[in-house]
Amino acid sequence: MRYAIMVTGPAYGTQQASSALQFAHALLNEGHELASVFFYREGVYNANLLTSPASDEYDLVRAWQKLNTQHGVALNICVAAALRRGIIDETEAGRLALPSANLQPGFTLSGLGALAEASLTCDRVVQF
């Protein structure tokens, strides 16, 4: 089956993002296809390059990035939600005259169209 995941919880403070990542790995281990992960609302914090957990804590942001590099899973974050929360890429930083970007490599700023496309092309969309 072809799946998409929507994450609405931040990297730290709730179980939503870590549960979504565990679910993603379970899907891939069982031979399913994971087309994309869409980060919405507080979920956009999963793409913050500046997140720096303690050395004895799990680095969820880099774990998402690893999912992207190892399995080619698209990591889309809602551009409107990201901008409201200070998550920006180089293009937006330039457009808004901000000193730097903080979007973790592997993540892409996307509109809700990416989520709509996933819901049309996947067998299941699972929200965390």
From Swiss-Prot:
**Matches recorded under SUPFAM superfamilies:** DsrEFH-like
Could you state one GO cellular component term attached to this entry? cytosol
Q: Where in the cell is it found?
A: Cytoplasm
Root EC class: transferase
Q: What is its EC number?
A: 2.8.1.-
Which GO terms of type biological process are on file? tRNA wobble position uridine thiolation
Active site at which residues?
C78
GO MF assignments:
sulfur carrier activity; sulfurtransferase activity
UniProt cross-references to Gene3D superfamilies, sorted A to Z: DsrEFH-like
Keyword set for this entry? Cytoplasm, Transferase, tRNA processing
Q: Does the keyword Iron-sulfur apply?
A: no
Q: Which family does it belong to?
A: Belongs to the DsrE/TusD family.
Provide the assembly information. Answer: Heterohexamer, formed by a dimer of trimers. The hexameric TusBCD complex contains 2 copies each of TusB, TusC and TusD. The TusBCD complex interacts with TusE.
What does the UniProt function comment say about this protein? Part of a sulfur-relay system required for 2-thiolation of 5-methylaminomethyl-2-thiouridine (mnm(5)s(2)U) at tRNA wobble positions. Accepts sulfur from TusA and transfers it in turn to TusE.
The protein here is known as Sulfurtransferase TusD
Lineage, uppermost ranks: Bacteria, Pseudomonadati, Pseudomonadota, Gammaproteobacteria, Enterobacterales
What gene name is given for the protein in this entry? tusD
